[in-house]
Amino acid sequence: MNKDVSQHTPMMQQYLQLKAQHPDILLFYRMGDFYELFYEDAKKAAVLLDISLTKRGASAGEPIPMAGVPYHAVEGYLAKLVALGESVAICEQIGEVGASKGPVERKVVRIVTPGTVSDEALLPERQDNLVAAICEQKGVFAIATLDMTSGRFLISELANKTALMAELQRVMPAEILYPEDFAYIPMLNNYKGLRRRPCWEFELVTAIQLLNRQFGTQCLDGFGVQQAKVALCAAGCVLHYAQETQRTALPHINSIHLSQDSEMVLLDAATRRNLELTQNLAGGTEATLASVLDKCVTPMGSRLLKRWIHQPIRQLDILKSRQDMIATLQQYEQIEPLQPLLRNVGDMERILARIALRSARPRDLTRLRTALAQLPLIAKCTQNLGACLAVLLSKNADFSELYTLLEQAIIETPPQLIRDGGVIAEGYHAELDEWRTLSAGATQYLDNLEIRERESTGIDTLKIGFNAVQGYYIQISQAQAHKAPIHYVRRQTLKNAERYIIPELKTYEDKVLKAKGAALALEKQLYEQLFDLIMPHLGALQQTAMALSELDVLVNLAERAESLHYVRPSFSLQRGINIKAGRHPVVEHVMVEPFIANTVFLNSQRHLLIVTGPNMGGKSTYMRQTALICLMAYIGSFVPAESAEIGVIDRIFTRIGASDDLASGRSTFMVEMTEMANILHQATAQSVVLIDEIGRGTSTYDGLALACACAEWLANKTQSLTLFATHYFELTSLPSQLKGVANVHLDACEYNDTIAFMHSVQEGAASKSYGLAVAALAGVPKQVIALAKQRLVHLEEFSQQTKMAQQHPQADLLFTVEMPEEEKMAPLAKAESAVELALRAITPDELTPRQALDELYRLKKLLSSS
């Protein structure tokens, strides 16, 4: 692109000047009915949007690459770009064509970015859409997140980069802002929407001034965030970015909240992944905890429930209050009456954000009107449901005047866009009604004029029409065109007709178009005034939306508890978990056969269980269900069990499954050890820890030694509430050596080389692992199973002979066994020949003489070929 803009046409000079202000993002440049892109933007958009790349003449002697999208379809293209992590500057024509010399005046009116979009078509309906800013100062990491669609503004400070990554994994922002001098950029490689920002945007003084100006305060003490200085730096950056992209006031962003670890049950990234809270291991949303629990009838309720799932809390008073409300809703049978009313509330939270940004569409206002109409009905349903629900719904103000305003101002079913007109209701504004009457009278006038002209000219094919290009016209068929009077001025010739204009029709056309234009301009003005009239109610409306979303979640959890037979858990201030007949909430939901419930009991005297049993026996399910039941209790939900008493929990850790990290060059074993190291460093006596088969990725003795050492550390040092699944039967001796350790196993029965899994947890260690039986079930060839059994006998007979293993620790255990000499010389497994396989497949009694002869020839041929 030529930097000397003077060599370009005036229009391209204007484009280049605007593009220079937004060099790193796509510029949608409005030209008539299209948004055009030029140069590198055009090439990039052509690839991303699968649109044609063309050329627009030449400027400065070079052809200009160009691509474009129709203005009326722009939302679909923006949605695709946002999903790809791209940002777009929208440049509109703000001047009148021909109003001044040179190109029509244009300016960038908004910037659409993945983290700050508010348009309904560009947003995931039931997921939060966040922009985050991160920074680090003197070893303190911080993150600030802003939800532009609700005004929710949160900050937190973190002890290390691992905690920061866990927080990013939790909130999954659509955009991440970081300072130019950020030293940890490589750890962000897996995220889209990365934006490097100048360091001055992270300065503390600048941030505090910006935040005070936004909130209309003199200091931030009232928000309790004044001590979180690093987090405030991040908050300043994210607020500046929001103002820069929206280019309008942000009245719905009116507070900021500091999240503290002491209020939460902490979950690291591995735990969220392994427990499949909102995303399964394959990356989908099926068979997750959220897929079972989330039957909310409003999108804002669904988003709130997912936030609860990802951030369980430790404040017992809030948890018990939620439980009380769920129990009350069940007791008074108000679930079924409330859900249809809440469904009509819709996504009030995001509608209010669009109103605050003055980007709400007419149908947003009708949805708000519908939501307000539900409030008296919801209040009536809940008026006798106890103090807790009364406190929740006390946030609802009286919006009867606002409802009346919207009822009078907006028609019942308005068009999608204000530019289409016909949004403001008749009777709302006298002048608008006058302009509309003048415009509407055109139909009768034109009918009368058509009849009069037919009679005066004698042309029976004469008719009056209108189109956007030609305006009003008189049309006469070609066969009768010669009869047109002399004062008819030809406007257009068609194949079968001629079109004319007369002075009277032209005068009326000007009058009607003026009336339509005046009506539309006044309607847009009145529509903007509606935003001004709603704005004083915005804070109260936001509080009401929050209350309704919480009510939706609680009604939903009450319905889930009732439908799925969940019980109310109790909380204890003592350390421990006592779950009677617990069930995995997801597995039982997808199973056809009945789920086998199991009990888990952990306390200060019994805090580590060695879990043994066969593969597929249910060890992982048992462990995960324990963690999920604890998590469900700590969001205020009822749980799948006969009874559950949950003690104080500060964190939940999991080390389950095997996966490598090729992008970072880490093997499966390295990933496993990294996760284990995090647990050993961070776990406390109040943590719940799930360990599944640690030590598999290295030599047998190394793995056994690591597993034993980790179990001892968890038993003696951290004394966490731990479920430790293993196939190393040597670990089952730990209860006799360590305090607080016990054995449990998943039961199974073996009969005639087949295995039946009981999925029942029993006290004591398993008798064997049944690995060969499971391999047979998986379809491993019988010859391989037979060979494995043979080798297993020798391994068991000579397992005490470890001399070679001690001399060569990494040697395969199979070759540490002294086998009889004749078996050393024997082939591992003689494969059956083609002839033998063919013979085995023949059933002689079923063959006719002719078939038998054919088979004999086939066998002889096979023998010759082999």
Curated annotation (Swiss-Prot):
CDD domains recorded: ABC_MutS1 (cd03284)
GO BP terms in the entry: mismatch repair
Family: Belongs to the DNA mismatch repair MutS family.
Organism: Haemophilus ducreyi (strain 35000HP / ATCC 700724)
NCBIfam families: mutS1, PRK05399.1
Binding site for ATP: 613-620
Keywords recorded for this protein, A-Z: ATP-binding, DNA damage, DNA repair, DNA-binding, Nucleotide-binding
Gene3D superfamilies to which the protein is assigned, alphabetical: 1.10.1420.10, 6.10.140.430, DNA repair protein MutS, domain I, MutS, connector domain, P-loop containing nucleotide triphosphate hydrolases
Any one annotated GO CC term: cytosol
HAMAP family: MutS
One GO MF term attached to the UniProt entry: ATP binding
Name the record gives this protein: DNA mismatch repair protein MutS
Pfam families: MutS_I, MutS_II, MutS_III, MutS_IV, MutS_V
Task performed by this protein: This protein is involved in the repair of mismatches in DNA. It is possible that it carries out the mismatch recognition step. This protein has a weak ATPase activity.
